[in-house]
Amino acid sequence: DKKDIARILELAEEDAAKGAGECDPRPAQVTDLALMDAYCVHLQQVIRTGVTDGSTGAPDVAAAKKAAEKPLAGMKIVVDAGNGSGGFFAEKVLAPLGADISGSQFLEPDGMFPNHAPNPENREAMESISSQVIKTGADLGLIFDTDVDRSSAVDEQGREIARNSIVAMAAALVSEDHPGTTVVTDSITSRQLTEFLENKLGLNHLLYK
């Protein structure tokens, strides 16, 4: 946003005028932070909380602890990162939660994208994840775009799960803890989704584009 950038520059000028821009003569200290590792641990915890919801149904304490730590044990989930940056989700998020990620493909980043376009809206990409799910007998297939801000999913039969259904499910999961919240989607959604979000869940549906 240009206004935000302009404001940052103004603040920098104000600080410089006050002398805040003078260099500290002390040697700088550099601290390495494994931000990606912290992010993956956060995602693991979000999934653990969402999947177990405080109850594992395990017969004893030890089994309950194991089930809580690895709530995806027994599930086979195939990830197709399309040689973008989403391979970490299989190796550092799903696998530590107990999921079998064998059969996941194109996890290594490669800017030439030699296998298919890293785009969950691309037909060839969707055919790739669908066929891999069927071939490996997976329970679920996940496919990401290059920078992992878009995804799609296919079921155990390789059928694409409608995006409206994914939004509806996610909204239903958060509606109790966040009543009246706003769900933002692009305009390519169905009237039925809006009716479900607003009339059934009591949420607001904001469409953009």
Protein language model annotation of sequence segments:
Residues 1-136:
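Gly/Ser/Thr-enriched, mixed-charge loops and adjacent short helices
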Residues 76, 141, 182:
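Hydrophobic "anchor" residues on beta-strands that sit immediately upstream
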Residues 79-82, 144-146, 185:
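Active-site flanking residues adjacent to catalytic metal/cofactor-binding acidic residues
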